[in-house]
Regions:
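Conserved radical SAM core fold
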Residues: 147-150, 181-184, 195-215, 240-244, ...
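Conserved Radical SAM active-site core
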Residues: 67-90, 105-198
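Active-site glycine- and acidic-residue-rich loops that bind
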Residues: 175, 243-256
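Cysteine-centered iron-sulfur cluster-binding motifs in ferredoxin-type domains/subunits
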Residues: 95-104
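Auxiliary Fe-S-binding modules of radical SAM enzymes
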Residues: 2-29, 256-339
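Structural preference for beta-strand elements that scaffold enzyme active sites
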Residues: 140-142, 173-175, 194-198, 233-237, ...
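Structured alpha-helical segments in the cores of large, soluble enzyme domains
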Residues: 130-134, 187, 217-230, 319
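Flexible, acidic/Gly-rich N-terminal and inter-domain linker regions that tether
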Residues: 1-90
Length: 339
């Protein structure tokens, strides 16, 4: 797959599978209109397709299917210790999509699901109902924790649903993290100061090597700049940093490139973090044998695989030395394991 996917269109999914139970759901009806009827298949339950035995994750990555389904059970989960809650009293993530349009070698999703296909749960109203009891106090919800919701916004409409819900609930803060270049799906909306649009940025060489099917660095930066100019709060995330030969030059040049495009004063925050993954997810990633990222000699502590502490510290020192030339330390957040 080439690095030229600015947003989601039906051509990126070869077929649309729909659970019979959600055929009449308003979101299903809207999505159906975007597909050729000959490529729509009705099923009883999403697991008939998503959980089939003997699937090839690698092969499916080149011909993804979209599955529309009804989610039973919890949409909301406590935020992971591998992520940043940005100081909010409560940090939750929403799981309204299984799988991702993109195919990044270092992503834990590679080892999490049996399929590379995407399941979109259309009953997002149930997520909102589950969230209401948490909104008596300050709460952050990450909508793209285990997918890229903005990448499929042209089909799903879920980001707009989240933004509409957030307007009515003043204790709700959203982080919408993306590698997409699809800000145009939100361009005409009024910015909400409690919503942060966060772009994951990597050197172009890292994108080409590890972040398959994702937009280029140039495209992501343009989208982030458009968001800033439209009045949105924008966070830039150089995370995960991949320790590879010449990483110092790759990532310091990246920071220069970012701030040649974006006024540092316009960036709400910059986050920096090196690669980390749960030991169980890393084991699953190794079984796929797709990338050298899985076979680095990581250190494992408290079930978390990370770079050896000296390397992790060196990565952070190199990036901070460059980043603080542009942004003060109080607007930079870093991830470090607890020693």
């Amino acid at each position: 797959l080439k690095h030229s996917s600015p947003s989601c269109t039906p051509r990126l999914f070869s077929h649309l599978y729909i659970e019979k139970a959600v055929l009449d759901h308003p979101q299903t009806r809207r999505i159906i209109e975007k597909f050729d009827r000959s490529n729509i298949i009705v099923i009883g339950h999403y697991k008939e397709v998503f959980n089939r035995p003997s699937q090839s994750f690698a092969a499916q990555s080149h011909a993804k299917k979209l599955i529309l389904a009804h989610k039973e059970g919890k949409f909301l989960h406590e935020g992971s210790p591998y992520s940043d809650g940005f100081g909010h009293r409560q940090f939750l993530y929403a799981s309204s999509v299984m799988g991702c349009l993109y195919d990044c070698d270092y992503c834990y999703l590679q080892g999490l699901y049996p399929s590379a296909n995407t399941v979109l749960f259309v009953n997002l109203e149930d997520a909102f109902a589950q969230l209401l009891p948490h909104l008596g106090h300050d709460t952050l919800v990450a909508t793209s924790y285990d997918t890229d919701t903005l990448a499929i916004e042209s089909l799903s409409g879920q980001t707009r649903q989240w933004l509409s819900f957030a307007e009515r609930h003043p204790n709700l803060h959203l982080e919408i993290r993306t590698k997409s270049a699809n800000f145009r799906s939100l361009r005409e909306l009024v910015p909400n100061p409690r919503v942060t649009l966060a772009w994951t940025l990597s050197p172009q060489a890292i994108i080409e090597r590890y972040e398959h099917a994702t937009p280029s660095l140039e495209s992501r930066l343009k989208a982030a700049k458009d968001a800033v100019e439209a009045g949105w709060k924008v966070r830039l995330c150089i995370d995960p940093v991949i320790h590879t030969e010449g990483f110092e030059t790759l990532y310091t040049d990246l920071i220069d490139t970012i701030f040649a495009s974006l006024d540092p004063e316009s960036v709400h925050q910059l986050t920096l973090g090196s690669f980390r993954m749960s030991q169980n997810h890393l084991r699953s990633l190794k079984k796929l044998r797709r990338s050298d990222v899985a076979f680095y000699p990581y250190e494992v502590r408290d079930e978390m695989a990370t770079y050896p502490q000296a390397i992790e510290q060196h990565i952070l020192e190199v990036l901070l030395a460059k980043a603080t030339l542009y942004i003060p330390m109080e607007r930079i957040r870093t991830w470090q394991r607890q020693s």
